[in-house]
Curated annotation (Swiss-Prot):
The gene is nqrA. Composed of six subunits; NqrA, NqrB, NqrC, NqrD, NqrE and NqrF. It holds the Pfam family NQRA_2nd. One of its GO terms (molecular function) is oxidoreductase activity, acting on NAD(P)H, quinone or similar compound as acceptor. The keyword Nucleus does not apply. InterPro entries: NqrA (IPR008703), NQRA_2nd (IPR056148), NqrA_C_domain (IPR022615), NQRA_N (IPR056147). It comes from Glaesserella parasuis serovar 5 (strain SH0165) (Haemophilus parasuis). One of its GO terms (biological process) is sodium ion transport. Keywords: Ion transport, NAD, Sodium, Sodium transport, Translocase, Transport, Ubiquinone. It catalyses: a ubiquinone + n Na(+)(in) + NADH + H(+) = a ubiquinol + n Na(+)(out) + NAD(+). It is an enzyme of class 7 (translocase). This is Na(+)-translocating NADH-quinone reductase subunit A.
Length: 448
């Protein structure tokens, strides 16, 4: 077991009841193009087309052969594009239950599948996009070979779902998915299954699966943390990672021949009336999913964690491909008298400069950052929440200044935006380090 000490479990109110309920019915789903780093689509459909579940919507021009499929059957009602014609979302009005079928196998055949059989089924169904690479967090090329594959079966994000609750309903599907993954490279690559201590995660002694437990505060449950401690990456070495619900979907694909797009997400946060786990589907319209669920007032719905999720509004008002939670907090627009110096008891700070830092209560966090952006202040805040073996203050300084050579030497290739979310949260200068990291990674990938 690997135990980390640095980190922070955010004391936010609205923790979900760990019981799965059926969510609101949604009649719109979407594929969000901007989730896929560096992807340039070649569209295979247009507005007004009727598509089946599992039908190809577009292909990545820059990653030949990688296709993105419809999460539900229905009519294409919108193809939204932003600046420079960047694909924002492909929206489907859900109608009917027609679907494309794929190769299916008996459970007893899974352990003898060839790498080509596994890859072909994953690619054709669109489930290849469940994989992401580290470094760069991109969908891998079809001819890429990772050092290993990481399956994340734990979650320490604020307000997260307990994976064990979901896996209890799909034990055999999860084991089938692990078996399929173990055959992706003919059994030559280790599958690292990362879980919480004492969790009852099924493995059924699948070949090439190595189980590692992680303990400690967030970010103990992030894939970036797991990769750093088990099989760290570099500019010449990569690994792939995916979450446990996609492993379930892979297991179901190979045993049923059908694309499984159900998702169990936590619907939680200070502004949710009844925080709980809800069953919905990939790409669900979040306005419909949260209808009647939220407290009065101006709320921000987030696809993903409050620390690193995406604001769900307008053309982005849908559950993301990699999101396992929907978080809701209030928009913090109120001005507070003497807000910088009053020792409030209803506020939280890692620096213990407010009375609330000394209590163990949960706080109704809002979107307010309590100050304007300013220079970095190196007072040890970053070191308190960064468990990885890097120098966070120096790394963040280099990211802010655009010095990619130094940032690469300090370990930025190991990171994804979510790995710096706590640094952003505790930053006295109110800096957002996620876009700085992405700009650095893009530059390194392009220029070396």
């Amino acid at each position: 077991m690997i135990t980390i000490k640095q980190g922070l479990d955010l004391p936010i109110a609205g923790k979900p009841e760990q019981v799965i309920h059926n969510g609101n019915t949604v009649n719109e789903v979407a594929v969000l193009g901007e989730e896929y780093v560096g992807m340039r689509p070649s569209m295979k459909v247009r507005e007004g087309d009727v598509v089946k579940k599992g039908q190809v919507l577009f292909e990545d021009k820059k990653n030949a052969g990688v296709v993105f499929t419809a999460p539900a059957s229905g009519t294409i009602v919108a193809i939204n594009r932003g600046e420079k014609r960047v694909l924002q979302s492909v929206v489907i009005k859900v109608e009917g239950d027609e679907q494309v079928t794929f190769e299916r196998y008996n459970a007893s055949e899974l352990s003898s599948l060839t790498a080509d059989q596994v890859k072909q089924n994953l690619v054709n169904s669109g489930l290849w996009t469940a994989f992401r690479t580290r470094p760069f967090s991109k969908v891998p090329a079809l001819d890429a070979v990772p050092s290993s594959i990481f399956v994340n079966a734990m979650d320490t994000n604020p307000l997260a779902t307990d994976p064990e609750v979901v896996l209890n309903e799909h034990k055999q599907d999860f084991v089938d998915g692990l078996t399929v993954l173990s055959r992706l490279f003919d059994g030559q690559k280790i599958i690292h299954l990362c879980r919480a201590p004492d969790s009852n995660i099924p493995t059924a002694e699948v070949a090439n699966v190595k189980v590692t437990s992680f303990a400690g505060p967030h970010p103990a449950g992030l894939s970036g943390t797991h990769i750093h401690f088990i099989d760290p990456v570099s500019v010449t070495k990569s690994v792939w990672y995916l979450n446990y619900q996609d492993v379930i979907a892979i297991g179901k694909l190979f045993t049923t021949g059908e694309l499984y797009t159900d998702r169990v997400v936590s619907l939680a946060g200070p502004q949710v009336k009844k925080p709980r786990l809800v069953r919905t589907q990939l790409g669900a319209n979040l306005s419909q999913l949260t209808a009647g669920e939220l407290a009065e007032g101006e709320n921000r719905v987030i696809s993903g964690s409050v620390l690193s999720g995406a604001k769900a509004v307008g053309v982005h008002d849908y559950l993301g491909r990699y999101a396992l939670q929907v978080s809701v907090i209030a928009e913090g627009r109120e001005q507070e008298f003497l807000g910088m110096i009053a020792p409030y008891s209803h506020k939280f700070s890692i620096t213990r400069t407010v009375l609330g830092a000394f209590s163990k209560k949960l706080f109704n966090f809002t979107t307010a950052v309590n100050g304007s952006e300013r220079a970095m202040v190196p007072i040890g805040s970053y070191e308190r929440v960064m468990p990885l073996d890097i120098l966070p203050t120096l790394l963040l300084r280099d990211l802010a200044s655009g010095d990619t050579d130094s940032a690469q030497a300090l370990g930025c290739l190991e990171l994804d935006e979510e790995d710096l979310a706590l640094c952003t949260f505790v930053c006295p200068g109110k800096n957002n380090y996620a876009p700085m990291l992405r700009a650095a990674l893009d530059k390194i990938e392009k220029e070396g």
